[in-house]
């Protein structure tokens, strides 16, 4: 049977047959480990370094990781996908994840591919591929809810930091299924001025009228904002390690995604995949830069279409697979910057 999409849904069979370095952490595992964020899941994967979001300009909406020793800052050296769709707001022009619209509560698995297999996807393939697999549509109607809370009693945190995750959906006898996913976070970390609000809503649909044809679609609306406590000098840390000396720093962003795909499998030796997607992203924030306070709103629009055809054949006693395809991506952005004197007291 041809593979076609090497990433697919990161099933155990896909991972076992993958000819290269590949690790998958599934939902049961990261729930059992008590992982509260994407960073905590990635940090447990061999060859991946995922440092904390700390220092000036850091917040929970960003993601930092590096594979096999590469610079982890904003994960700019790796291709980051969600169900095969690029996560960065400009995957070719600005691949940094200063806004990473991925909530671990909406994921079934985190799939990390290292080595030569990354070449097939790109564009930042030198640092491997990380594909976040969203929660699958249940075969039978189901409603699932879980809540995760964090408390730092010895810090300046005011109350709990809580995340709610919800899944509602199912599949009918005619092969038509859908699911609504939601993950929301409220609260602050152990530092002052670290309040975070995240709302991540995903709607998935799939229709498989026969074994040969399968249609799927997904929409996402992600909206979040976070106060940024910033770094501390040695003297300030000794005085109070929980304080924040940057009361104006704040980041916010939102993203809308729409994607649709078609899979045609006429027989065990052929497979055709067609995927189209559109994303619109806003990222902005206030940053204290000494004498000035800056506001930098940036909007991005990305449109993409990708096709893949795979053909399997036998040569002697060995079986081979040849794939051909194309990718078209169009990116556009609108970036502004405003500033005011820091001593004006106005934003």
Region annotations inferred by a language model:
Residues 30, 42, 110-111, 130-132:
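Non-catalytic regulatory/gating segments with a bias toward low-complexity or hydrophobic composition
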Residues 117, 134-169, 189-190:
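Short strand-turn segments of transmembrane beta-barrel domains in outer membranes
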Residues 39, 43-86:
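Extracytoplasmic beta-strand/coil segments of soluble accessory domains associated
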Residues 150-154, 186-191, 197-202, 241-248, ...:
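Extracellular loop and loop/strand-boundary signature of outer-membrane beta-barrel proteins
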Residues 3-33, 59-64:
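N-terminal periplasmic "start-of-domain" segments of outer-membrane beta-barrel proteins
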Residues 208-222, 251-347:
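Face-selective signature of the C-terminal outer-membrane beta-barrel domain
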Residues 156-186, 190-228, 250-267, 316:
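Transmembrane beta-barrel wall of Gram-negative outer-membrane proteins
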Residues 85-114:
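Short acidic/polar hinge/loop motifs at secondary-structure boundaries
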């Amino acid at each position: 049977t041809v593979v076609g999409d090497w990433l697919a849904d990161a099933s155990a069979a896909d991972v076992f047959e993958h000819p290269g370095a590949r690790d998958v952490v599934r939902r049961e595992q990261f729930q059992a480990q008590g992982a509260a964020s994407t960073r905590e899941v990635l940090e447990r994967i061999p060859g991946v370094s995922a440092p904390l979001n700390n220092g000036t300009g850091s917040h929970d909406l960003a993601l930092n990781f590096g594979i096999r020793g590469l610079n982890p800052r904003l994960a700019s050296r790796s291709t980051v996908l969600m169900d095969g769709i690029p996560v960065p707001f400009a995957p070719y022009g600005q691949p940094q994840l200063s806004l990473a619209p991925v909530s671990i509560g909406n994921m079934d698995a985190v799939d990390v591919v290292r080595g030569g297999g990354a070449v097939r996807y790109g564009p930042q393939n030198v640092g491997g591929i990380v594909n976040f697999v969203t929660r699958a549509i249940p075969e039978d109607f189901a409603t699932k809810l879980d809540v995760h809370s964090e408390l730092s009693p010895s810090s300046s945190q005011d109350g709990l930091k809580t995340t709610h995750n919800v899944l509602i959906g199912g599949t009918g006898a005619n092969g038509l299924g859908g699911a609504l996913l939601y993950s929301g976070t409220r609260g602050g970390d152990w530092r002052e001025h670290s309040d975070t609000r995240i709302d991540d809503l995903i709607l998935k649909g799939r229709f498989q009228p026969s074994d040969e044809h399968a249609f799927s679609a997904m929409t996402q609306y992600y909206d979040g904002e976070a106060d940024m406590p910033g770094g501390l000098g040695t003297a300030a840390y000794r005085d109070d390690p929980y304080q924040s000396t940057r009361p104006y720093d704040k980041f916010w962003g939102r993203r809308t995604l729409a994607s649709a795909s078609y899979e045609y499998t006429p027989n065990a030796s052929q497979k055709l995949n067609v995927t189209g997607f559109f994303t619109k992203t806003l990222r902005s924030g206030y940053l204290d830069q000494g004498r000035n306070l800056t506001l930098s709103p940036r909007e991005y629009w990305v449109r993409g279409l990708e096709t893949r055809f795979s053909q399997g054949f036998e040569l002697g006693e060995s079986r081979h697979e040849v794939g051909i395809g194309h990718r078209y991506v169009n990116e556009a952005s609108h970036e502004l910057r405003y500033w005011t004197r820091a001593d004006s007291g106005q934003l």
